[in-house]
């Protein structure tokens, strides 16, 4: 029983890759065909690989692991934050600060500063400070919250990273490699799959595609933490005889194209 259906993937535009002139040849095995200068991702493979990614994330959760969701492109920011929070995990959805993981001690000092400013507001310190100083502290807090708020309570270096568009998040990928942190990622036709431990071939530019896949990874973590006996039926879908086949995809490619130009 698959965690995601071909129909769901199709409706979210997961099959639309990049223009053929913007591709990584290593993605060839995940490509079904080309239409109108756009590569079409093989959704039969995506269905199976989403299952593999789901199981991987679930296993990490079952072992008490920590997950970091990363996606700083505009199309991913909302889903990354919302789904990480829903799963009780952590996220980076604005610019990745170099050393976020490889210089964890320094980052922890900045997080401590963020928490100190929050405490100053809560304990009434703000009320006795000059307005100009309070304004400066609020500005500092806003910046710290923007870049570090999603990892402020992360107890340690994560046990797995889920990344939307590893090509854009190359610094995060490099840091994960240095620290031997496994990566699960949405990988579009212009990415290098060899850099990723668990590949999910997918359009990483369509908001609906990002939300669909990211939600499934959050579902996996939730199930892993709850135990399978408590998992909701909605986490899984069964293919019906009417489910969209990969051949039918070609017929709709000329319609709603949400790939990156």
Curated annotation (Swiss-Prot):
GO terms for cellular component: cytosolic small ribosomal subunit. GO terms for molecular function: structural constituent of ribosome. Keywords: Ribonucleoprotein, Ribosomal protein. It holds the Pfam family Ribosomal_S2. One of its GO terms (biological process) is translation. CDD domains: RPS2. Belongs to the universal ribosomal protein uS2 family. This is Small ribosomal subunit protein uS2. The gene is rpsB.
């Amino acid at each position: 029983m698959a965690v995601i259906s071909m129909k769901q993937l199709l409706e979210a535009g997961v099959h639309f890759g990049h223009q053929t002139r913007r591709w990584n040849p290593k993605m060839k095995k995940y490509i079904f065909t080309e239409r109108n200068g756009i590569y079409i991702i093989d959704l039969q493979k995506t269905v199976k690989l989403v299952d593999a990614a789901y199981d991987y994330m679930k296993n990490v959760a079952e072992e008490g692991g920590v997950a970091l969701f990363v996606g700083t492109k505009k199309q991913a920011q909302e889903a990354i934050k919302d789904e990480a929070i829903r799963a009780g995990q952590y996220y980076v959805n604005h610019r990745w600060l170099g050393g976020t993981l490889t210089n964890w001690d320094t980052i922890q000092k900045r997080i401590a500063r963020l928490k100190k400013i929050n405490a100053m507001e809560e304990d009434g310190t703000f009320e006795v400070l000059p307005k100009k100083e309070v304004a400066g502290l609020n500005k500092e807090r806003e910046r710290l919250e923007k870049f570090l708020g999603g990892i402020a309570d992360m107890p340690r270096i994560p046990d797995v990273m889920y990344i939307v568009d590893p090509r854009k998040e190359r610094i995060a990928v490099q840091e994960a490699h240095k620290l031997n942190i496994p990566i699960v990622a949405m990988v579009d036709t212009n990415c290098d799959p060899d850099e990723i431990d668990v590949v999910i071939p997918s359009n990483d530019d369509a908001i609906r595609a990002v939300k669909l896949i990211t939600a499934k990874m959050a579902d996996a973590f939730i199930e892993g933490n709850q135990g399978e006996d408590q998992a909701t039926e909605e986490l899984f879908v069964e293919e019906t005889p009417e489910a969209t086949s990969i051949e039918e995809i070609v017929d709709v490619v000329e319609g709603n194209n949400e790939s990156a130009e």
